[in-house]
């Protein structure tokens, strides 16, 4: 792992994954550009560290649009990584977008049986988001973690399904 890749407190160590030969797409929102740059860079590092070559990158306007993009792509990729940033403001909008994005991503993953690494930050302020973005000085790299989670889930499911019922 690079020196900028810092796992969150109690995060599993998923190093050593073999994602070679997998077709993976990263679906990334555009709101909060600095944070998104860190998340996207971290996700791409996480995929490369897992042996995934040439992941596709699809940009959508915001986190609300992530579920429909993932739903459209799920049948064409082995795994997806969804990245976004939602920062609390003074209205209920934060709650609505967080709920819609989370439920939407969950629904797509369950319905299509496609692992989706969940890299949507839901933060009270920009400082919290920057601290999790995998940037220089950040304490965590949630983009990296989301990418590794997608590959680890796909690997676990593939292994379980290959071994058949016991």
From Swiss-Prot:
Sequence positions that bind (2S)-2-hydroxy-3-oxobutyl phosphate: 90-91, 132
Binding site for 5-amino-6-(D-ribitylamino)uracil: 31, 63-65, 85-87, 118
UniProt superkingdom: Bacteria
Metabolic or biological pathway, per its Swiss-Prot or TrEMBL entry: Cofactor biosynthesis; riboflavin biosynthesis; riboflavin from 2-hydroxy-3-oxobutyl phosphate and 5-amino-6-(D-ribitylamino)uracil: step 1/2
A GO molecular function held by the record: 6,7-dimethyl-8-ribityllumazine synthase activity
InterPro entries linked: LS, LS/RS, LS/RS_sf
Enzyme Commission (EC) number: 2.5.1.78
Top EC category: transferase
Keywords of this entry: Riboflavin biosynthesis, Transferase
Cysteines paired by S-S bonds: none
SUPFAM superfamilies: Lumazine synthase
Ranges in coiled-coil conformation: none
Pfam families documented for this protein: DMRL_synthase
Catalytic activity: (2S)-2-hydroxy-3-oxobutyl phosphate + 5-amino-6-(D-ribitylamino)uracil = 6,7-dimethyl-8-(1-D-ribityl)lumazine + phosphate + 2 H2O + H(+)
Cellular component terms per the entry's GO annotation: cytosol; riboflavin synthase complex
Active site location: 93 (proton donor)
Gene3D superfamilies: Lumazine/riboflavin synthase (3.40.50.960)
One GO term (biological process): riboflavin biosynthetic process
Family: Belongs to the DMRL synthase family.
Purpose of the protein: Catalyzes the formation of 6,7-dimethyl-8-ribityllumazine by condensation of 5-amino-6-(D-ribitylamino)uracil with 3,4-dihydroxy-2-butanone 4-phosphate. This is the penultimate step in the biosynthesis of riboflavin.
NCBIfam families associated with the record: lumazine-synth (TIGR00114)
Record-linked HAMAP family: Lumazine_synth
Protein's UniProt name: 6,7-dimethyl-8-ribityllumazine synthase
Species whose genome carries this gene: Cutibacterium acnes (strain DSM 16379 / KPA171202) (Propionibacterium acnes)
Gene name of the record: ribH
């Amino acid at each position: 792992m690079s020196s900028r890749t810092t796992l969150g407190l109690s995060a599993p160590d998923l190093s050593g994954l073999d994602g070679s030969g997998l077709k993976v797409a990263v679906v990334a929102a555009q709101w909060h550009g600095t944070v998104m740059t860190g998340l996207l860079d971290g996700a791409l590092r996480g995929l490369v560290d897992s042996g995934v070559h040439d992941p596709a990158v699809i940009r959508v306007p915001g986190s609300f649009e992530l579920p429909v993009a993932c739903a459209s792509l799920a049948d064409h990729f082995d795994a997806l990584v969804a990245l976004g940033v939602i920062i609390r403001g003074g209205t209920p909008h934060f709650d609505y977008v967080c709920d819609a994005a989370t439920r939407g991503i969950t629904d797509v993953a369950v319905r299509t049986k496609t692992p989706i690494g969940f890299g949507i930050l839901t933060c009270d302020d920009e400082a919290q988001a920057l601290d999790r973005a995998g940037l220089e000085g950040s304490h965590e790299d949630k983009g990296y973690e989301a990418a590794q989670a997608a590959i680890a889930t796909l690997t676990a499911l593939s292994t379980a399904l290959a071994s058949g019922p016991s």
